[in-house]
Amino acid sequence: MPRVILPLSESSEGLFENTPDKTSIEQFKFFHADEGKPLATPWQVALSRAIMLREYTVPEGVILDCACGSGIQIAAYSEILKRPIVGIELNESRARASAVNFRTVFTERGDNSLDRLKDSIFIVGDGREGSQIMPLLNLDNDSIAFLHLDPARPRNSRAHALSEMAPQLDEVFRGWKPYIKCSKDGPAILLDLSPRLSSAQMIEVEDLVEEFWPNTNKTWTWTSRGRGRVDRLALWLGAIAEPDTARRFVRIPPDPTSPPFILLGGKPIAEQEDTQEPQFIQPQRGSYVSIIDAALVESGMANDWLNASLIGNYV
């Protein structure tokens, strides 16, 4: 049976792993129950994503995260969009931590009204079961304006197959489709997936989306904080996708006060992705050698960046 947690009144007693987020200017201290810290989204990444989301037309209503973990991402969405939120988490300790973390962000960033805090709710329960959760929310059936899903993946998996995700995408889509608002551009959904997905798996995700929302715009987004790795791979859908733009690369700078670098473009995902063939060219005076982010290469947009930046004058 789902259990309701109210962030306005939830106590932090019994919670642990209360550690500072070094990427936040405010030096927030977040709770991460049951070894949740390695899985949590850094505040700088969560905030950058929320600021990007603000550029799109998200319908009126609440923000839903049906596998909210420590609640950092959904707190960032609420803080930037000024919307109430619904966070669902199967693990009770993490659900409680999410509620307390949300209250921390709300109070320390100095919101003047308690309405958003009062109207937000966290639930210990199965994030797939929209029909069980909706009666607890006292909302109209189409009140979900935006769905965020970051399914858990096995830590020791190298492949991160779609069948290993929990909850699975089709189960969440089926459980929540009746309650998600749809504009002329489709639903506003963000799927935060494993950076290890192959191009074939990415196409599998796209096909799954098409089963529930045909002809929906899709923009794959690779996010990096450097260090030679892809930090996040997400699929932005419908109302929050870039029309006719299949790919986006986002580089989060080390300085949390600096804006991210964003590059749009690329080709639709293909099962056999094009590979960059090495070019053996004798360097000429005035040519450039570029050392670029590995995630930019992974996104398939390295040539887009090079052509835009150097107009072809590179080795």
Language model features with spans:
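Conserved SAM-binding loop of SAM-dependent methyltransferases across substrates and taxa
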Residues: 70-82
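Glycine-rich phosphate-binding loop signature in dinucleotide/nucleotide-binding domains
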Residues: 56-59, 137-143
